[in-house]
């Protein structure tokens, strides 16, 4: 593949920026990757590594047939994703999910980018709009975009940014968990990548313990919000556990503490009223994170409240939970169909700042932005992935998913979105069962998902194989 002399500048070394830089460089186009850490850090980052995971260590389901994020995984592998390659190399057992050793994952991404001959990494903060001589730029500054740069971008658009909160779950040392009360089991004994079907630690609560826990959560002292945070809405996919508890006493046991698909081997005849799950957080198996337990409780309150959970009475925390404010653009109004800023098309955006939600989605948007930028630099036509693919469905949501609804007289605010089958266009033909058998209920739903997944992977492969043509 012939090389292009002029670089594309990628600002931000998170999941999206790292993936974008990789996709550009592998297409023979030089890249300058700008990362402000360690010169300037954030409240959520702990290292200066590229693609650091600041929240969960899970990339969610790896099922390429029945789960939309699993389809996105598969498409990214088809496209030579650096993020998925590093995740596969650093996976830890997690039932049906793809979870990673966060430090090993970040090191693998950092090394791959440092070793690529067409990638230059500059450790510096960008506080203003990129200089005019940077004619191709991807801004992948993420949910923790520095205030100065956010203001500079907003001054160009005339719009205000939307913001939401992401909360961070606590991490517990394995050897402090009482396995005489807790046990290993995946829900419904389902194995996943590198897993055994017994990949989660489960802590059971009876009805009285559950209600006492809910009371303690609600009464627990929360960290105060700064003035600018008070009006910021939470994203439903990452609600603090105490906010869920405040929404209803039974909310948690139908959410992250649901007891279904699990049997306590210490007391197999008694069904738990609720169950707390912990997922392996590092390859050594020495750390486990509390699934769905992101929180804004003060640190002292967290230790006190979470130690009321059976099995965690003597828990030692490697990290306590926290909360950080995320910022994202009103992308349907501000970005075109290839993620360029309408007000200044030399600027392209990628990752969570575009309004996608989740590690995998952020990296996928980075993958598309990188391919678009490389094609543009090489004078090739910009062809978005088909709407029938997970990438195409995600892109359509970000760049146009809400504008049509508003124009039709049904306004609603643009919100962060995980990939899901609801973003895919309907099947041209409904799946059929065996001759003489009509699909119904769950069987019909699963057949539709499998058909959508098969269509997505076939169409993604065809898109990737399409020869480039001149713009």
Swiss-Prot record:
FAD binds at residues 12-17. It is found in: Cytoplasm. This is Methylenetetrahydrofolate--tRNA-(uracil-5-)-methyltransferase TrmFO. Pfam families: GIDA (PF01134). GO terms for biological process: tRNA methylation; tRNA wobble uridine modification. It comes from the Bacteria. The keyword Nuclease does not apply. The keyword NAD applies. PROSITE patterns: GIDA_2. GO terms for cellular component: cytosol. It comes from Xanthobacter autotrophicus (strain ATCC BAA-1158 / Py2). It is an enzyme of class 2 (transferase).
């Amino acid at each position: 593949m012939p090389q292009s002399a002029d670089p594309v500048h990628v600002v931000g070394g998170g999941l999206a920026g790292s993936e974008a830089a990789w996709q550009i460089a592998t297409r023979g186009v030089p890249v300058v990757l700008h990362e402000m850490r360690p010169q300037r850090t954030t409240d959520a980052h702990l290292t200066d590594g590229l693609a650091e995971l600041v929240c969960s260590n899970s990339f969610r389901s790896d099922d390429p047939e029945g789960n939309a994020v699993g389809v996105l995984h598969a498409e990214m592998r088809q496209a030579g994703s650096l993020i998925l390659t590093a995740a596969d190399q650093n996976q830890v057992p997690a039932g049906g999910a793809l979870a990673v050793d966060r430090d090993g994952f970040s090191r693998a991404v950092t090394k791959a980018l440092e070793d690529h001959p067409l990638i230059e990494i500059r450790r510096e903060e960008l506080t203003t709009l990129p200089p005019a001589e940077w004619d191709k730029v991807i801004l992948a500054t993420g949910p923790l975009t520095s205030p100065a740069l956010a203001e500079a971008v907003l001054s160009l658009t005339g719009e205000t940014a939307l913001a939401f909160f992401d909360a961070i779950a606590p991490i517990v040392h394995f050897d402090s968990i009482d396995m005489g009360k807790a046990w290993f089991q995946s829900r419904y004994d389902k194995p996943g990548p590198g897993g055994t079907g017994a990949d989660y630690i489960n802590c059971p609560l009876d009805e009285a313990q559950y209600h006492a826990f809910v009371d303690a959560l609600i009464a627990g002292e929360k960290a105060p919000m700064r003035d600018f945070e008070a009006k910021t809405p939470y994203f439903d996919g990452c609600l603090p556990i105490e906010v869920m508890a405040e929404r209803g006493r039974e909310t948690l046991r139908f959410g992250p503490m649901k007891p279904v698909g699990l049997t306590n081997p210490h007391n197999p005849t008694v069904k738990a009223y609720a169950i707390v799950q912990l997922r392996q957080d590092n390859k050594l198996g020495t750390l486990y994170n509390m699934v769905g337990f992101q929180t804004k409780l003060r640190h002292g309150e967290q230790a006190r409240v979470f130690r009321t959970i059976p099995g965690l009475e003597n828990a030692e925390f490697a990290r306590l939970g926290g909360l950080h404010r995320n910022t994202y653009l009103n992308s349907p109004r501000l970005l075109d169909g290839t993620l360029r800023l309408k007000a200044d098309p030399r600027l392209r955006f990628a990752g969570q700042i575009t309004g996608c939600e989740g590690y995998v989605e952020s990296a996928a948007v980075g993958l598309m932005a990188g391919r678009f930028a490389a094609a543009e630099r090489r004078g090739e036509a910009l062809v978005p992935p088909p709407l029938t693919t997970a990438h195409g469905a995600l892109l359509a949501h970000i760049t146009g998913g809400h504008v049509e609804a508003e124009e039709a007289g049904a306004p609603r605010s643009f919100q962060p979105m995980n990939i899901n089958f609801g973003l895919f266009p309907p099947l041209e033909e409904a799946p059929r069962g065996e001759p003489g058998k009509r699909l119904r209920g769950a069987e019909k739903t699963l057949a539709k998902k499998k058909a959508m997944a098969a269509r997505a992977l076939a169409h993604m492969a065809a898109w990737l194989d399409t020869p480039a043509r001149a713009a």
